[in-house]
């Protein structure tokens, strides 16, 4: 099969496929005869309509189907014969100059995978993040857990920061009400930044049953464009004040966190274990991000446009599905521009190609034991870890995510063993983010 592969721009290639008319016609005749056997046409018994009539009715569509099938088959044969590593799907175009009456020509335009050459990893710098979890971090986490279980009790006094208040309010701009500017029995916690600072400051010091006018200046960058940069006067009536009460760290508190016998020491051990696991996950993610950035620097790579577009479309669909899962039913019909996802898609495709090369060259495929360790780590935070492990192993497709993580872990370890590693110790707050 003599076919010339023409190089276009970057990774794009072109081949012209010749389909003999004799083959097209023979395959078309075969398809029409198959159609004849199934056809139900008025005036004829099933399968007994004349072939000539079948050809008149279905000949054009049958020939198009045959040409499409032959083009796909011929392109596959050419790709195998020429050892072409095709990325994505080809597009087929008609050839204007059909100079050979014996055959029909079609141009196949496609991309090939780039050659991936891993650069000198010893020249790359990688940041390895570390963090520790001690008694202070456990205390901090327990305090967060206490705040999450705050109870509010009604009090007869003026409102203070930290109280939950229930109010009626109506806002006006230049004496006129505005959309979203009024509500009844609206509850919020003072000092939690749920409302604008001037609004909250106006409520502090009020008692149940009191009303007052509070002037509020909306910021220029306020999310409500109709009121951004404007001044409103809110008439506020305070209906109820409730004081926050945090639970004591005792047996009842420990039981609420899943410690059956209420042992506070066991609870702290469990908190430390869970927090340590989460801290480890986060520092590993940051280290992995640094490793991936180093790999992108070490490899000059142009990702195939077809694969980038496919990944961008997948990311768009993923975002729409997330919206749907959050209750936005109409999100499935959103027309999200793929350009929103192109940068992320290009990074993912490039890293996929680099990792595949690195794993293949350095035999970094994970062992069964490594995959089992990842699954066990997933399961550890659940009430019945064995049930979770059994779920993963009940369907081999469910092991794809653990396998990918095991591969990435091997890659990270490999790069850390080659690159210049700078250790960076982070505090608990830096790792976990600000948690009040």
UniProtKB/Swiss-Prot annotation:
Keywords from UniProt, A to Z, are: Cell cycle, Cell division, Chaperone, Cytoplasm, Isomerase, Rotamase
Q: Does the keyword Signal apply?
A: no
Write down the InterPro entries for this protein, in alphabetical order: PPIase_dom_sf, PPIase_FKBP_dom, Trig_fac, Trigger_fac_C, Trigger_fac_C_sf, Trigger_fac_ribosome-bd_bac, Trigger_fac_ribosome-bd_sf, Trigger_fact/SurA_dom_sf
At the top of the EC hierarchy, this enzyme's class is isomerase
Q: Does the keyword Chaperone apply?
A: yes
EC code(s) of this entry: 5.2.1.8
**UniProt function note:** Involved in protein export. Acts as a chaperone by maintaining the newly synthesized protein in an open conformation. Functions as a peptidyl-prolyl cis-trans isomerase.
Protein's recorded name: Trigger factor
- In the record, what lineage is assigned to the organism producing the protein? Bacteria, Pseudomonadati, Pseudomonadota, Betaproteobacteria, Neisseriales
Q: What would be the name of the gene that encodes this protein?
A: tig
